Amino acid sequence: MIPDPRDVILRPVVSEKSYGLLDENVYTFIVHPDANKTQIKLAVQQIFSVRVLRVNTINRQGKRKRTKHGWGHRSATKRALVSLAPGDTIEIFGGPGA
């Protein structure tokens, strides 16, 4: 159980693909790996005061990367694609609604 909504939503994803989804009112976040869709929905609604229609999640495996001393590994992440109700926007992204 993750009690605080700010422990569920870790940070927004800043990428070309996430900015492209802003036109469809879909926002992308890195979330806690143990969070489920219901917890993510409630956290976004509490933090940003918006209505969430749908939450899709993606578990991304960490990439293996070469370092000076051998092979390293990036950590795995969980992403949430959050669809908002028409008319609701989140201003932190600086997208079409901002």
UniProtKB/Swiss-Prot annotation:
Which Gene3D superfamilies did the record assign? 3.30.70.330
Keyword check for Cytoplasm, yes or no: no
**What GO cellular component term, any one, is given?**
ribosome
Alphabetical GO biological process terms: translation
Which Pfam family is an annotated match for this chain, by its short name?
Ribosomal_L23
Q: Name one GO molecular function term.
A: structural constituent of ribosome
Q: Which domain of life is it from?
A: Bacteria
User: What keywords is this UniProt entry annotated with?
Assistant: Ribonucleoprotein, Ribosomal protein, RNA-binding, rRNA-binding
Query: Record's family?
Result: Belongs to the universal ribosomal protein uL23 family.
Subunit composition and interactions: Part of the 50S ribosomal subunit. Contacts protein L29, and trigger factor when it is bound to the ribosome.
- Cited function: One of the early assembly proteins it binds 23S rRNA. One of the proteins that surrounds the polypeptide exit tunnel on the outside of the ribosome. Forms the main docking site for trigger factor binding to the ribosome.
Q: What is this protein called?
A: Large ribosomal subunit protein uL23
Name its species: Frankia alni (strain DSM 45986 / CECT 9034 / ACN14a)
Lineage summary = Bacteria, Bacillati, Actinomycetota, Actinomycetes, Frankiales
